[in-house]
């Protein structure tokens, strides 16, 4: 017993086991029929889990779903976090239904972002707990306090640094490639040694490669394989043998080559061996020596280490000359429309007018071309048969071979009274001295006369055509009908005069129709609302018209409808048309009783099949005259069928007129009306048959007892509203609307009343206004569509759209106000008043977005809640401690109820959540050199701002290679007028070319530098969705004890459903359930993803942008060009000569500020691969087949375990590629992808220099000069100098300095005094820098910065120093030349200091002495001996003679 008690005590003392974590606080509970599964997740600041605790009551079993959170970063609230899209703190939030989703937050505490350029570290500083994230080429994140540093180690860093609410994106490059440094940092070497090794890596590689080749050759020399090198050494040995035999002095003792420092050898060059020098000399002098053996020497070289070492050096140099360094290789290289709603209103109106004139233009076009073709045909016929045409005016006389005018012509046999007198005016005398010959001029006057008549007729036809086109429509008699008291037959729809009908009227909205009718004075301004309310479709318009209970109102609406569809009744002229479909279908779908008995009668065939309609009148008059006798019911049915068909054919006023005739039993008037319709449309056979049938039925005796259908009574007009005051209030109006006003800019309304007025034209009730204020002088305004709201500050005041009184009441026009004053009006209670209730407001909410917005005319801090309502909130950072993460107070301390703001009032929002701003590098161009000095000497090494001297800002980092170019244009006595130069530059970012501009005589005049500052193509991408790995699964499930699973399982948007039947069994059922192999477990699920990757789709076509700059010594200017449009200015003429076309991928992914391309799913596509789970607007979408299991508990509900919901193939995203040449610029909601490493083509440039009067330049010039320089040594920006030169004449001056100057020659003019130079110094020049301009020596003051930055910041689309260096120096030997040899000599320079010159002189002297002794002296001695031999030979020859 004691043991049992001890066991119970121990068991009770042990803590209760809890899954996931112990303790924690409940953040939300949700009793529901559906249970959630147990989920345990971790975010950046906490852990959260969900549990389902079942509760049973009288109505069933319910689940108390609970969410519990435990903080891991307990003080994260100190950084004042706020929600923002793309934030770097991931927090799991709990929804009202306990569904979990991931949200992004950032801290609101202040944070300073900087970059230490001397240590290549990002510096972050804050006063409290804060969080940072670095994304891009370096990815790091974490929490910190005070100050932290993040070291950069990539050669070129493309980064987005985020700390608190600030984000900055920039591009930074080191002054050397960092792959070597990163590799050595992983070893035991100290950082300084690693940096030194990498700085000298080129010479180290050269020496190492030389040693490796030497070792290889030394090993090969031990074997016969070394003789493979003989083809290399044989030419060398042969050349040496030639030089040996012919050019070297011989030793007097042995006969070999002179060897002052060694003894005579025993081996001859031919291979023979002698013991003494005398025998060797005898062998050489007697001619027995065959000479130098090149093959033997080559074999010796193959085995010797000396030639091997020389060969290794040469081979290493050759290899490194043609091999590109790995560090400098670049990996991965290898339209405007407008929517209709975007157009302004005047353009839309213009489009409508164009449509209205379209038919007229087509008609005019057809008639004009017809006239043209007719004129051409007449011209061709006239040309071919012109004599027949001209025969009208003149005749040809064969007797006298002349043409005679027919006017006054008289014949005398074969002769006429005008013989010997031609139409051309020439006479022929009887003597035959003047003989006439028929020529072209004889009939020219008649041709002209005929052409004149033809042109007159042609112009007359054109005038008739144009006059017919511009002819206006006739007037309308609609106004006459409005003046009648009651309806007449000629005031019904078919008989209204609509004037000229144009088909484009159908495209006009009823608003335009109302405007047209008001312009014709046909309606009042108070009638416009009833016309604009007509539905656009014909069926709806006819129903709307028939609903009108007053003749004048119905006539007005019908006339408006017929004005729009002006061919509605003209379609009745024949047997088809869109307006006849309804009544013809109605007839064919209903049968006449008589036709059932007599189907072959002509009338019945006409009604059913459209046959025999012309003989239908005598048919039923003879064949069916006895059918209706004693059959009143059948008579009534058939006549009602015919009248109903007529009703469907003629709706509106026609049907109302027929209804009035039927109610009055005015059968004669009815038949007269139908006969008028038949007379108006004589070609409509079926309509004629129906009307004749109605007339026939009227003549039968059964007509006296005819009962028409009840619907005709609904078409009768009601009494006039003016005579029935109960339509308004039942008493006289207490408001004096004669004194009504309608003021503008009124936002509040007291005593709001509805107003009804009668139109003076149609009598329609005009109820589009409300009245405010006192009855004696009410203010009337347009009736709001959304009602009025009670003000939140004064309950007696009413506002529009919301309770804040921000919207102005719309004043009515003066025309409407005048009509109201002249009309009879009543006030009635306004029904659409929304009183203020506390339930409409809120003290706190889960924030969706926050920021500052334009609210009406004010700038308010606004918070958008998760229910998409907007509230005024001045804090936006105060948490509601009674709620979970994400709930913010709308007022300080959540004490005041705030009411929502209508979204219409909100505009131009600077959202902090959905549209976070990302800063860029600030580039400041400083115009004055003194200000530039001040800017760079402040040592702002941690600033993200760049300061550039304006006059040299467009120069490259490295001095370009110059080429000579000659000026072109007209040469004069003074020089060249309008001079220019032409050249071509590759469109590659960072390319620079220097031009040494010469005159045509070859005289160097000045230097100009062309620099491609940026060259890229880019596109803008819009975000589609986010994706990421699945971190958990949201689940809701339920179970049934018995029965099948539901056919349709309720689920939320984006959730997948699952179900399994026959889940109830013994030991696996809830309490009270007794079932075996029955029941169901079902539910829905959704993945919880961690957003790691965002997918974007291309929204714009590729845009190519190139910025080309020209820099002189006194000015600089740039131009932006594209492949389409050439640039022509006073300074530049630039265009693309060749264009390379590239394209960016359609869909890209962005992860950690890095672009990834590959197989990525589009929005709404869920195929296997990256992006088949998509989060859009806070909802996760995907597809798949959920997999789940359940655990059974005795007398309890099952524990559902969902193992998989969506098919998430996020692992495929890890195989996406990251192009090295792409750069990324993030903006609010979009990104811009830029490729800047492609050659976009070739730019043809024409630089206009103006008038260069170089022939007047002086050779010597007096210059008053001073200079000022600022910059740094061995840095990115180098030294910038401003020279102030004063001279009275123009001159071309060379520039000389101890440092490297970018411009070697400048033009000096009297009008320009400020000149700028960029200078590169490798050594500190002292307090002044000596610059020589022409013959003037300038001691420019120096302001040097001691900082040694190793990293350079640059805008995203511009190149850095390391990039230009790689482009300039692409081989290892180039690196050795620029850096290696200098590095070798650097230790000696540091050792000897200022005496380095003496040391270099000593070394050079020793080398020169050795060359003299071993090279020059033997050659000189050989030359001396040769000259002596020639002299001895000369003396011997002279003795012989």
Swiss-Prot record:
* Swiss-Prot/TrEMBL keywords: Fusion of virus membrane with host endosomal membrane, Fusion of virus membrane with host membrane, Glycoprotein, Host endoplasmic reticulum, Host Golgi apparatus, Host membrane, Host-virus interaction, Membrane, Signal, Transmembrane, Transmembrane helix, Viral attachment to host cell, Viral penetration into host cytoplasm, Virion, Virus entry into host cell
What's the superkingdom here? Viruses
Whether Transmembrane counts among this entry's keywords is: yes
Which GO BP annotation is one of this protein's? symbiont-mediated perturbation of host process
Site Cleavage — annotated at 473-474
- Its signal peptide is 1-13
Q: How is it modified after translation?
A: Specific enzymatic cleavages in vivo yield mature proteins including nonstructural protein NSm, glycoprotein C, and glycoprotein N.
Pull the Lumenal topological domain ranges from the record. 14-200, 327-365, 474-1395
* Cellular compartments per GO CC: host cell endoplasmic reticulum membrane; host cell Golgi membrane; membrane; virion membrane
Question: What stretches pass through the bilayer?
Answer: 201-221, 306-326, 366-386, 453-473, 1396-1416
The segments annotated as topological domain Cytoplasmic are 222-305, 387-452, 1417-1441
One Pfam family this sequence matches: Bunya_G1
Kindly list every residue the record annotates as glycosylated.
57, 490, 1177
Please give the InterPro entries that the UniProt record associates with this protein. Answer: Bunya_G1, Bunya_G2, Bunya_nonstruc_pro_NSm, M_poly_OrthobunV
What biological function has been recorded for the protein in this entry? Answer: Glycoprotein C and Glycoprotein N interact with each other and are present at the surface of the virion. They are able to attach the virion to a cell receptor and to promote fusion of membranes after endocytosis of the virion.
> According to its UniProt record, which protein family does this protein belong to?
Belongs to the orthobunyavirus envelope glycoprotein family.
The record's note on quaternary structure and interaction partners says: Glycoprotein C and Glycoprotein N interact with each other.
The record's annotation in NCBIfam families points to: bunya_NSm (TIGR04210)
Record's protein name: Envelopment polyprotein
Protein's organism: Bunyavirus La Crosse
């Amino acid at each position: 017993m004691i043991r049992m008690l001890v066991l119970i005590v121990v068991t009770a003392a042990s803590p209760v086991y809890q899954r996931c974590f112990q303790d924690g606080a409940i953040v939300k509970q949700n009793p529901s029929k559906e249970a959630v599964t147990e989920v345990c997740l971790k975010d950046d600041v906490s852990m959260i889990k969900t549990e389902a605790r079942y509760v049973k009551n009288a109505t069933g079993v319910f689940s108390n779903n609970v969410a519990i959170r435990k903080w891991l970063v307990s003080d994260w609230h100190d950084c004042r976090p706020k929600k923002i899209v793309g934030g770097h703190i991931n927090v799991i939030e709990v929804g009202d239904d306990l569904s979990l989703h991931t949200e992004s937050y950032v801290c609101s505490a202040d944070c300073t972002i900087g970059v230490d350029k001397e240590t290549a570290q990002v510096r972050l500083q804050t006063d409290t707990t804060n969080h940072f994230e670095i994304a891009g080429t370096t990815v790091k994140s974490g929490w910190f306090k005070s100050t932290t540093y993040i070291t950069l180690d990539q050669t070129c860093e493309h980064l987005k640094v985020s700390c608190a609410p600030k984000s900055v994106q920039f591009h930074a490059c080191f002054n050397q490639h960092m792959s070597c440094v990163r590799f050595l940092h992983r070893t035991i070497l100290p950082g300084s040694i690693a940096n030194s090794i990498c700085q000298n890596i080129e010479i180290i590689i050269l020496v190492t490669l030389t040693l490796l080749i030497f070792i290889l050759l030394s090993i090969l020399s031990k074997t016969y394989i070394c003789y493979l090198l003989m083809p290399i050494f044989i030419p060398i040995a042969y050349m040496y043998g030639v030089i040996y035999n012919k050019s070297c002095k011989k030793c007097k003792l042995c006969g070999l080559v002179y060897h002052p420092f060694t003894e005579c050898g025993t081996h001859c060059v031919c291979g023979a061996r002698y013991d003494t020098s005398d025998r060797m000399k005898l062998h050489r002098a007697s001619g027995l020596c065959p000479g130098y053996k090149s093959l033997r020497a080559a074999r010796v070289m193959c085995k010797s280490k000396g030639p091997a070492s020389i060969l290794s050096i040469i081979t290493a140099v050759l290899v490194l000359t043609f091999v590109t360094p790995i560090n400098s290789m670049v990996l991965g290289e290898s339209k405007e429309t407008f929517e209709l709603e975007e157009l302004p209103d005047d353009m839309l109106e213009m489009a409508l007018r164009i449509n209205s004139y379209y038919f007229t233009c087509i008609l005019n076009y057809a008639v004009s071309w017809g006239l043209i073709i007719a004129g051409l045909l007449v011209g061709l016929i006239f040309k071919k048969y012109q004599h027949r045409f001209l025969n009208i005016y003149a005749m040809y006389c064969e007797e006298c071979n002349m043409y005679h005018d027919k006017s006054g012509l008289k014949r005398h046999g074969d002769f006429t009274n005008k013989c010997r007198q031609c139409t051309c005016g020439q006479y022929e005398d009887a003597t035959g001295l003047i003989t006439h010959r028929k020529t072209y001029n004889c009939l020219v006057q008649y041709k002209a006369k005929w052409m004149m008549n033809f042109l007159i007729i042609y112009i007359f036809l054109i005038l008739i055509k144009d006059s017919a086109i511009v002819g206006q429509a006739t007037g309308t008699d609609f106004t006459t009908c409005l003046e009648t008291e009651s309806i007449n037959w000629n005031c019904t729809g078919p008989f209204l005069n609509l004037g000229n009908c144009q088909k484009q009227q159908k495209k006009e909205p009823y608003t335009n129709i109302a405007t047209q009718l008001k312009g014709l004075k046909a309606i009042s301004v108070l009638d416009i609302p009833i016309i604009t309310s007509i539905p656009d479709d014909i069926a709806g318009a006819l129903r709307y018209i028939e609903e009108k209970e007053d003749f004048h109102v119905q006539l007005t609406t019908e006339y408006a409808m017929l004005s729009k569809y002006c061919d509605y009744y003209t379609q009745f002229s024949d047997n088809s048309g869109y307006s006849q479909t309804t009544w013809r279908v109605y007839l064919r779908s209903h049968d006449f009783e008589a036709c059932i008995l007599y189907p072959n009668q002509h009338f019945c065939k006409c009604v059913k099949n459209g046959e025999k309609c012309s003989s239908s009148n005598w048919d039923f008059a003879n064949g069916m005259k006895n059918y209706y006798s004693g059959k009143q019911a059948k008579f009534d049915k058939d006549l009602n069928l015919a009248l109903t068909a007529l009703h469907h054919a003629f709706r509106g006023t026609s049907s109302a007129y027929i209804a009035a005739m039927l109610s009055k039993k005015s059968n004669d008037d009815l038949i007269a009306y139908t006969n008028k319709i038949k007379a108006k449309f004589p070609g409509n056979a079926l309509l004629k048959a129906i009307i004749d049938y109605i007339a026939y039925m009227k003549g039968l005796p059964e007509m006296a007892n005819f009962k028409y259908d009840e619907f005709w009574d609904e078409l009768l007009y009601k009494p006039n509203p003016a005579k029935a005051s109960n339509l308004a209030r039942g008493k006289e109006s207490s408001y004096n609307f004669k004194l009504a006003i309608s003021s503008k800019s009124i936002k509040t309304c007291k005593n709001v009343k509805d107003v009804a007025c009668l139109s003076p034209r149609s009598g329609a009730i005009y109820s589009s206004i409300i009245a405010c204020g006192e009855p004696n002088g009410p203010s009337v305004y347009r009736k709001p569509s959304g009602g009025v709201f009670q003000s939140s500050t004064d309950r007696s005041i009413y506002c529009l759209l919301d309770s804040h009184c921000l919207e102005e009441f719309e004043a009515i026009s003066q025309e409407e106000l005048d009509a109201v004053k002249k009309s009879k009006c009543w006030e009635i209670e306004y029904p659409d008043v929304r009183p203020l209730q506390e339930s409409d407001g809120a003290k706190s909410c889960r924030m969706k977005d926050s920021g500052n917005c334009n609210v009406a005319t004010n700038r308010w801090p606004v918070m958008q809640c998760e229910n998409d309502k907007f509230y005024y909130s001045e804090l936006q950072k105060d948490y509601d401690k009674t709620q979970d993460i994400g709930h913010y107070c709308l007022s300080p301390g959540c004490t005041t109820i705030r009411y929502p703001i209508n979204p219409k009032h909100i505009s131009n929002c600077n959202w902090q959540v959905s549209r976070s701003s990302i800063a860029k590098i600030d580039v400041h161009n400083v115009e004055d050199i003194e200000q530039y000095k001040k800017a760079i000497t402040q040592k702002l090494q941690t600033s993200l701002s760049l300061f550039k001297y304006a006059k040299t800002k467009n120069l490259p980092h490295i001095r370009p290679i110059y080429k000579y170019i000659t000026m072109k244009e007209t040469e004069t006595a003074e020089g060249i007028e309008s001079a220019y130069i032409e050249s071509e530059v590759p469109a590659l970012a960072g390319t620079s070319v220097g031009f040494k501009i010469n005159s045509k005589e070859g005289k160097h005049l000045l230097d100009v530098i062309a620099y491609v500052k940026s060259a890229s193509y880019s596109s803008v991408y819009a975000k589609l969705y986010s994706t990421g790995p699945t971190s958990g699964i949201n689940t809701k499930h339920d179970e049934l004890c018995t029965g099948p699973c539901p056919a349709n399982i309720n689920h939320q948007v984006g959730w997948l459903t699952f179900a399994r039947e026959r889940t109830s069994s013994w030991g696996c059922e809830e309490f009270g359930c007794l079932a075996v192999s029955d029941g169901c477990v079902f539910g829905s699920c959704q993945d919880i993803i961690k957003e790691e990757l965002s997918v974007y789709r291309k929204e714009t076509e590729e845009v190519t942008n190139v910025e080309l700059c020209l820099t002189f010594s006194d000015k600089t200017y740039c131009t932006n060009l594209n492949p389409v449009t050439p640039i022509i200015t006073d300074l530049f003429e630039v265009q693309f000569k060749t264009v390379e076309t590239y394209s960016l991928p359609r869909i890209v992914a962005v992860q950690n500020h890095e672009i990834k391309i590959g197989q990525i799913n589009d929005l709404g596509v869920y195929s296997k691969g990256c992006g088949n789970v998509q989060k859009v607007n806070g909802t996760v979408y995907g597809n798949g087949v959920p997999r789940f299991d359940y655990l059974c508990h005795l007398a309890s509900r099952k524990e559902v375990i969902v193992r998989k919901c969506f098919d998430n193939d996020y692992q495929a995203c890890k195989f996406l590629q990251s192009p090295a040449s792409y750069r990324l610029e993030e903006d609010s909601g979009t990104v811009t992808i830029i490729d800047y490493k492609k050659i976009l083509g070739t730019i043809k440039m024409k630089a206009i220099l103006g008038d260069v009067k170089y022939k007047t330049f002086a050779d010597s010039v007096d210059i008053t000069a001073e200079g000022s320089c600022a910059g740094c040594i061995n840095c990115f920006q180098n030294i910038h100098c401003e020279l102030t030169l004063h001279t009275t004449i123009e001159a071309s001056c060379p520039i000389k300095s101890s440092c490297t100057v970018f411009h070697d020659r400048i033009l000096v003019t009297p009008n320009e005094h400020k000149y700028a130079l960029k200078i590169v110094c490798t050594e500190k020049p002292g307090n002044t820098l000596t610059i020589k301009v022409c013959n003037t020596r300038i001691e420019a003051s120096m302001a040097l910065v001691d900082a040694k930055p190793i990293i350079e910041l640059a805008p995203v689309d511009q190149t850095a120093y390391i990039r230009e260096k790689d482009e300039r120096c692409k081989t290892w030997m180039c690196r050795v030349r620029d850096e290696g040899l200098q590095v070798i000599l650097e230790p000696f320079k540091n050792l000897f200091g200022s005496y380095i010159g003496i040391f270099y002189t000593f070394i050079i002297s020793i080398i020169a002495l050795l060359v003299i002794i071993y090279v020059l002296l033997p050659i000189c001695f050989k030359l001396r001996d040769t000259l002596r031999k020639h002299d001895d030979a000369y003396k011997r020859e002279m003795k012989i003679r």
